[in-house]
């Protein structure tokens, strides 16, 4: 079986980050991020991971014509037939225009954003059964949820049993809270810098109490809502530097005035980071306890962009109450194509149990190989 899985959907016009592709050829797995082949983490002009796709064809010695299934995230709208024609007939030449309708019906599969997170975590673990929770900033336009949780079991025909979910319409969540905290500290969307800065700070109980007031609890609807009114930011086109270009730096001013900035006004940045991180840890553990209070599972898997935070993960490992806790090597969007591909492989009866893929396990860093001549050509 040959599978190509792409994130984001190359024909859905929405801006996404962490473009990646996974290809499976029988037992071989190729899974990689586009940024690693471009040398640029952020490229606002890219629509899909074309370098990673082409290198995957080379690595696995396959072509677009002999792919059994193409997997994409659920799009935000119905894709125009002419766009599919360009992609599959004109560009990749995977099929003919005459056979395109049948091709789309039989060979093109869609998986929702948070389910893809779930499958990435589960299939890269060695668990046969586990509770699992996915939390991020808000999915994408084809899956406008910020949380999904339930139980996943290899022996169940439907695989994943949903316990609950929270939609973006319910308001901002803990993922957005950490984003706002990061923006306040002047790091834009580089959340890892907030976590790093926290290691130099101290907990301030007064600040902790005031930050917690920004949250509204509604456990009957399985929701913690974060509220932070922010003023409009100003563009900064006069400061553009073409050699270090990132659109976000010129479309908004970071930080902006907000309820959060007023609360944190007289505190040191490192103490804001430390106190904010501790609150995030406490809120996340509280949610896990509430969502799985009736569960008898011994294992927990945490996925979604929120769990790129290693300090949070360490705290959960110690405080969750589960015997084993697993965090995938890429809990954020860079692992989505892998989850979608492995899900399809499982549904076609090709995965019997969660076996590791070599010493490093199944992960989204199984990229292209380069011989010595190719390396020399790159360096020269």
Where are these regions (language model features)?
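Short acidic/glycine-rich loops and adjacent helix/strand connectors
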Residues: 1-380
């Amino acid at each position: 079986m040959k599978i190509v899985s792409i994130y984001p959907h190359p024909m859905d016009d929405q801006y996404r980050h962490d473009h990646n592709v996974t290809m499976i050829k029988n037992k071989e797995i190729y899974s990689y991020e586009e940024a690693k082949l471009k040398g640029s983490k952020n490229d606002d002009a890219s629509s899909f991971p074309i370098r990673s796709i082409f290198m995957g064809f080379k690595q696995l010695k396959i072509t677009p014509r002999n792919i059994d299934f193409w997997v994409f995230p659920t799009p935000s709208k119905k894709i125009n037939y002419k766009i599919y024609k360009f992609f599959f007939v004109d560009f990749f030449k995977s099929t003919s225009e005459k056979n395109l309708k049948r091709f789309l019906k039989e060979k093109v599969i869609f998986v929702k954003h948070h389910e893809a997170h779930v499958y990435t975590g589960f299939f890269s673990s060695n668990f046969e059964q586990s509770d699992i929770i996915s939390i991020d900033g808000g999915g994408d336009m084809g899956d406008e949820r910020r949380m999904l949780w339930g139980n996943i079991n290899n022996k169940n025909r439907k695989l994943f049993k949903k316990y609950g979910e929270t939609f973006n319409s319910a308001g901002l969540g803990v993922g957005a809270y950490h984003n706002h905290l990061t923006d306040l500290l002047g790091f834009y969307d580089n959340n890892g810098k907030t976590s790093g800065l926290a290691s130099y700070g101290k907990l301030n109980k007064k600040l902790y109490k005031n930050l917690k007031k920004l949250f509204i609890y509604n456990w009957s609807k399985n929701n913690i809502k974060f509220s932070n009114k922010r003023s409009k930011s100003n563009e900064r086109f006069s400061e553009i530097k073409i050699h270090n270009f990132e659109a976000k730096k010129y479309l908004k001013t970071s930080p902006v005035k907000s309820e959060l900035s007023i609360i944190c006004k007289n505190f040191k940045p490192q103490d804001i980071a430390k106190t904010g991180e501790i609150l995030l840890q406490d809120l996340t553990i509280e949610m896990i306890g509430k969502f799985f209070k009736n569960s008898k599972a011994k294992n927990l898997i945490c996925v979604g962009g929120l769990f790129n935070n290693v300090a949070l993960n360490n705290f959960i490992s110690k405080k969750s109450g589960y015997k084993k806790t697993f965090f995938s090597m890429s809990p954020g969007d860079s692992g989505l194509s892998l989850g979608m591909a492995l899900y399809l492989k499982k549904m076609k009866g090709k995965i019997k149990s969660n076996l590791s893929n070599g010493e490093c396990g199944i992960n989204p860093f199984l990229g292209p190989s380069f011989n010595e001549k190719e390396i020399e050509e790159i360096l020269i």
